[in-house]
Amino acid sequence: MRRKIIAANWKMYKTCAETESFIKEFIELSKGYEEKEIVICPPFTSLYVASKLLKDTAIKLGAQNMFWEKEGAYTGEISPIMLKDLNCTYVIIGHSERRNYFSETNEMINKKIKSAFNYGLIPIFCVGEKWEERERGKTEEVITKQVREGLEGLEKENVEKIVIAYEPVWAIGTGHSAKGEDANEVAGLIRKIISEMYDTEVSQKIRIQYGGSVNPQNITEFLSQNEIDGALVGGASLKPQSFWNIVKS
C-alpha cells in the first residue's frame, strides 16, 4: 500500500518571519496526525528556520530546486549537500516554471535527479503537458519523453523511491484543474512507462502526485483515484488552515 504524500510548494512566497508563523500554526493543527506524509517546500531563504522548527515533528522538509554539482563556481545556485545540511528530505526537480522561465531541459533535470539520489535526497520529479499539446493529442508523447529522458540511466532501487508529480502546465496557477479521471489516466500512463523502463514492481512502488490548482474543494476528487497517491499544492498551501484542510481530507 502506497502512503499518500501531500507536499506544499510555496514558490517565491514567504519571508523567514512568515515561514515561522505558518509552521508554528501548522504544527499545532496537525499535531498527532500520521496518516499521510506531509512535506513543506519553502524558498531557499526560509529553509534554515523551517528546518529548526520541523526538527522534532513528522513533517518533512523539501527544497524547490537544486544544482547537480556538489560545489563550485555556480553563482546563485544551491547544491545537494547544502540541502542535506539543512535536513531536507525532498527536492522538487523539473517544475514547469523552471522548464519555462529558466529553460531547464530533460537532460538538466536528469542530472539533477541523479545528483539528488547521490546525496541522499528524494526527488519530486515534475512532468506535464501544455494546453496546446493536450489539444493536439500529444499528452502521451510529451509525458513519455519527459519521464524517459528524466529517468534515463537511473538505478531501479532509486527509481522506486521517487515521487512523480503530474502537473499539467495549463492547470498551474490558473484556477483550472484537470478532472480526476483525466489525471488518473496520465498517472496510469506514467506507471506504464516506468514498467517498460524497469518492471511492474517498480511502477507500483513509485508514488504519483497530482498538481495544478489543487484546493480543499477538489482534493478528494484526485485522492480517490486509484493511480494517484497525493498532491503537490501551490497557492492553497500558503495558509495553514487551507493546507491542513487538504492534508486531512
Curated annotation (Swiss-Prot):
Belongs to the triosephosphate isomerase family. One of its GO terms (cellular component) is cytosol. Homodimer. Pfam families: TIM (PF00121). Its main location: cytoplasm. GO terms for biological process: gluconeogenesis; glyceraldehyde-3-phosphate biosynthetic process; glycerol catabolic process; glycolytic process. It is an enzyme of class 5 (isomerase). It catalyses: D-glyceraldehyde 3-phosphate = dihydroxyacetone phosphate. The keyword Cytoplasm applies. It is found in: Cytoplasm. Its EC number is 5.3.1.1. It comes from the Bacteria. CDD domains: TIM (cd00311). Keywords: Cytoplasm, Gluconeogenesis, Glycolysis, Isomerase. This is Triosephosphate isomerase. It comes from Dictyoglomus thermophilum (strain ATCC 35947 / DSM 3960 / H-6-12).
